[in-house]
């Protein structure tokens, strides 16, 4: 497999993880995530020991959705965890975990930093996703872009500074709130993937 192929595969994983944080799983997305191709992808990903437990939870949840009610319950989990903004939720914004302030503000320093990164790459947050730029979904989508368009050193710096720096705190908050465990598994997989990617990108 060439380096181009490897980077493309890495980008696909980041895009997948980004999509799961960007919006709830609807009927069309469920079909995609449980298709034969997706099952092969999950199977391949689960072969890595650090990913196995999280991938198994994600697969069992998705494959276990057999009716609209179960799909709505997963959508309710997404809403309750990421959209409500209470102490019983885990808002996926870097600024809430990296700011030293007692009452960190949305659209703060991390948002401004991400907005500048996007601007430099001639990218922007899509209009149908009205969220601050330091939303985890935006950061993972940007990393997918970097995989195919930037030097390893740029990718490494972004992962260490902007993603890995707060993911563990986010997961700690998320696991306290996530009764069903699906999104905790997605977040834990994300952190494990980021850690592995950092190790691969670091110079020998």
Curated annotation (Swiss-Prot):
Xref: Pfam families: Nitrate_red_del
The UniProt entry, under Gene3D superfamilies, shows:
1.20.120.1820, HscB, C-terminal domain
InterPro entries noted in UniProt = Chaperone_TorD (IPR023069), DMSO/NO3_reduct_chaperone (IPR020945), HscB_C_sf (IPR036386), TorD-like_sf (IPR036411), TorD/DmsD_chaperones (IPR050289)
Q: Where in the cell is it found?
A: Cytoplasm
For biological process, the GO terms are:
protein complex oligomerization; protein folding
Name the domain of life this protein comes from.
Bacteria
Cellular compartments per GO CC: cytoplasm
Predominant location category: cytoplasm
Q: Which UniProt keywords apply?
A: Chaperone, Cytoplasm
Q: Which NCBIfam families match?
A: PRK04976.1 (NF003442)
The Swiss-Prot or TrEMBL record describes its family as follows:
Belongs to the TorD/DmsD family. TorD subfamily.
Report the function annotation for this chain.
Involved in the biogenesis of TorA. Acts on TorA before the insertion of the molybdenum cofactor and, as a result, probably favors a conformation of the apoenzyme that is competent for acquiring the cofactor.
> How is this protein named in the record?
Chaperone protein TorD
Lineage of the species this protein comes from: Bacteria, Pseudomonadati, Pseudomonadota, Gammaproteobacteria, Alteromonadales
In the UniProt record, the gene name given for this protein reads torD
């Amino acid at each position: 497999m060439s380096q181009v192929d490897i980077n493309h595969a890495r980008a696909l994983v980041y895009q997948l993880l980004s999509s799961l944080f960007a919006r709830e799983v609807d009927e069309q997305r469920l079909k995609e995530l449980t298709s034969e191709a997706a099952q092969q992808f999950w199977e391949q990903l689960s072969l890595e020991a650090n990913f196995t437990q999280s991938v198994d939870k994600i697969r069992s949840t998705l494959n276990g959705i057999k009716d609209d009610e179960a799909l709505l319950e997963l959508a309710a989990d997404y809403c309750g965890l990421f959209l409500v903004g209470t102490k019983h939720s885990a808002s996926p914004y870097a600024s809430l975990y990296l700011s030293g302030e007692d009452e960190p503000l949305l659209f703060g320093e991390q948002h401004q930093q991400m907005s500048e990164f996007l601007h430099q790459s001639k990218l922007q947050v899509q209009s149908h996703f009205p969220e601050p730029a330091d939303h985890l979904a935006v950061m993972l989508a940007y990393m997918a872009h970097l995989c195919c368009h930037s030097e390893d050193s740029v990718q490494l710096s972004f992962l260490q500074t902007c993603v890995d720096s707060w993911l563990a705190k986010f997961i700690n908050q998320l696991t306290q709130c996530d009764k069903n465990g699906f999104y905790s598994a997605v977040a834990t997989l994300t952190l494990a993937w980021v850690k592995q990617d950092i190790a691969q990108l670091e110079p020998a």
